[in-house]
Amino acid sequence: MKHANPPVLSTLIAAILSTKGGVAKTTDTANLGGWLADQGLKVLMIDADIRQPTLSSYDPLDYEAPGGIYELIAHNELDPAMIVSHTAILGLDIIISNDPLGELMSLLQAAPDGVIRLRHLVRQIPGYDIILIDTIGARTIALEMVLLASDLVVSPVLPEMLSAREFLRGTLQMYQDLQPFTRYGIPLPPLKAVINKLDHTNDAREIHHNLLQVLQHKQQEQELLVPTEILTTPVYASVAYRRAASLGMPVHRLDAARAKGRTTPCAAETMRSLAEELFPQFISLPSLNREGIA
């Protein structure tokens, strides 16, 4: 009897997005990308943070393309050899941010298709299972462009009420403002919030409960335009994330197992749990490489 071929899934485009800076969007993007690539998926990261392009220098490169996001957006360049750099991690590529003068922001504001340009372009990039887009930490046309280009938005939230309120005020308000695009066949992506930098002084249950209460109220009042949830997997504050960034490696390789007596998950466990919540359609594929998963 012949075995059925596994389903062919279309590329999923996920934005790591927040209207607030300093919530570890880049760290999440780099570590999720590295973990997914190590499981055998083809992953493309796009550094759309044109003000602080940290993701572009996070991983060492085996091949650096002559161009990057500027050529993609300004010139509609889609030749991988021109815009796609290869990291030292097998299966993990990146389109770097290369707009030091900040010209893209003005270009997008002046272009008739500025806010939807990336949506058209990114869907023409072949050969990837998942595309992860790191974003600028402020409400700009560049941030709106990434949201409208995405199939899923992952929004990091710090375990403090000020950050939670910014998520509720800034990110959800942006969805409200972009709702008119749905009339033209551009759906707004579902939204998943992840608690970042959780430490032992923070009461995760209280923060989680407070956010859930607000979201449930908004759901009852029909104020939420898309499916919105808070992930059950938090990212714990750990020196491993800073060390991994310094070494230019995914954190799951550095913090691969839970030491005896440790109560919080190791980074490998956290990345696996996050990926299972965010990308269940890919994580369940039987063809994935399971070696090295904690």
Where are these regions (language model features)?
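P-loop NTP-binding core
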Residues: 1-294
